[in-house]
Amino acid sequence: LSLADSLMSELLKMTPYDFENLIVRLLIKMGYGTLKQNESAVTQKSGDEGIDGIVSADKFGFDSIYIQAKKWRSDTTVGRPEIQRFLGALAGQGATKGIFITTAHFSKEATAFAEKQLHQKIVLVDGNQLTELMIEYNLGVSVVETYVVKRVDYDFFNDDL
């Protein structure tokens, strides 16, 4: 199994609530919000009105990004109806930005629908993109080996010593 496949296997074992927490942690590692100032949160388990979490768009908390996290089998497809429901949930919160993250894939109709929204920006992240982001931001993975390659710094020798 590849690293991404192994990560997906672990993601699929998580409870939905733990998966939502992982998504918020990933977004924090990517530079959104900060847990220290309680700017990022997973919403309560029930009655979340279609919103699984909220992160601030920047360190100052000027804008919020609403999260929908769906841990579905990786061979399933998220369709347009799910994106429409998320859009409705965003509207209910008065929100303009949302991220729909899933372990599954998005249908062409879902992607096209999200892309044509004018008043609300919805970013779709599928299972492949999710595992790539986890690897890139070192969430749920550890570095086994690091190689340092050095070369001569010619600028150092050209400056006045």
Residue ranges of each PLM-predicted region?
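Mixed-charge (Asp/Glu-Lys/Arg
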Residues: 1-161
